[in-house]
Amino acid sequence: MIKLMPHTLLVAFSVMMFQTKAQEAKTNSFSLQQSIDYAYKNSPNYLNAENDVLMAKYKRKEVLGMAMPQIGTSVDMKNFMKIPTSVLPNFVAPASYSGSIGALQQAGLPVVADPARLDQNNYPEIAANFGTTFQAQASASASLLVFSADYLIGLKATKEYISLMNINVTRSKVDLVSQVSKAYYSVLVNKERIQLLNANITKLEKLLNDTRAFNKQGFVEQIDVDRLEVAFNNLITEQQKVVRLISLSENVLKFQMGYTGQDNLVLTDSLSITDNSEITVTKTDATKRSEYQLLEVQQRLNTINVKRLKFGYLPTLVAYSSFSYSGQRNDLKYFTKEHVWYPTALLGGTLSLSIFDGFQRHYKIQQAKLDFKKGENTLRNLQLAIELEGASAAVNYNNAVASLQVQKRNLDLSKNIYTVSQKKYEQGVGSNLEVINAQTSLKESEINYFNAVYDMLVYKVDYLKATGNLVK
């Protein structure tokens, strides 16, 4: 009985352990579309983009509230532990002196008044405490923005801002579909690679074991065994690399989907290359791209900004009113019948109009107009860039399709060469070295083929994204 090599046993043991853990862990099945739908609900970046739309809508409602009556109430209570002191001119002493002189004169007595004593400035000021220990006031006020050009323009800007955030959601959706699709294809391609590698390992291992048996019987040299063992070890190393690559690509897919669970992912779509016809290079419609749409909205906002500055010359009118009750006491008996509350009411309005600002607003308008012109140039440049990107994406895809066709043909030829060389060797009419060379060529053809498959799939996603057709 032919013994398996130690590293073969190690790989087999690792595979069994992996399968055991996989059976213990839960699995979730996803097609490509299901992966995308899952990402819509769980990708943090996409969810933030949707939240930005809600925030923009709430911001518009906030601005709408500025035109509604602003009503407020307040209650104020003060306890003056030291009643405020006021300093007054001494009008009491001159008045008292004048009264005394007048009384003496009325009595018929000869009295001559002193003018200095009639001047209150010749007496020291009087310090007096005015008020009560406790003062309370309850008031209600209301104001209404009757007219403001800034408000009207700002309200229009909030509507455009909502459009901006909606387009940003579309852009995030396109990016998400692109990222999830590429990650999904990466997993599929690597799993196809591992299947072919496993098949090649099985074939080469059988050939190696047979060659060892022939060597023991003296039919082949040890160098023939060594050559096959080197080739076998290289395949095992390649297998381990692809296994790790599958794990990495699955983690990338989970990340793009926003998948936080530890469960295994089972991809239900197969790697079928059916639609691989070349694309006719045509002019890309830039208006279908979210980036172009975002700049269009930005241009509308630039126009609104110019209007806002121009309308800033118009006045702003605000109406307001207030009503209050106040009570002043030396104790806290505020709600007895003998104590009175004193009402105050007012109604007013404020009209604000800028007369001259040193031409500041004029130059702000000129800057805003230049921003609009810069936006036009940026929009035109983006249109040219999108057209170039679409043409480049079509060329890249067509090149990938052509490369895939060549690599598929090379793979078929390599398989045939390997099969023929193996049969010739088993029949004793071929050399061991011929088998090794055929196997090496087959491995390279498989790598090139799967790279071409992945490139074709990725370039197709890039083409659909560049032409604005990735998300319908």
Segments predicted by a language model, with ranges:
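Bacterial Sec-pathway N-terminal export signals of envelope proteins
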Residues: 22-85, 261, 267-303, 471-472
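Periplasmic alpha-helical coiled-coil/stalk elements that build and connect Gram-negative outer-membrane
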Residues: 58-60, 167-286, 400
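Small/polar, glycine/serine/threonine/aspartate-rich low-complexity segments that form flexible
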Residues: 24-28, 74-140, 270-277, 322-353
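Short segments within alpha-helical structural elements
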Residues: 65, 237-259, 412-469
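Sec/SRP-type N-terminal targeting helices
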Residues: 47-51, 64-65, 146-173, 223, ...
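Bacterial Sec-dependent N-terminal signal peptides
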Residues: 1-33, 40, 450, 456, ...
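Amphipathic alpha-helical coiled-coil scaffold segments and their short linker/junction regions
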Residues: 36-40, 92-123, 259-322
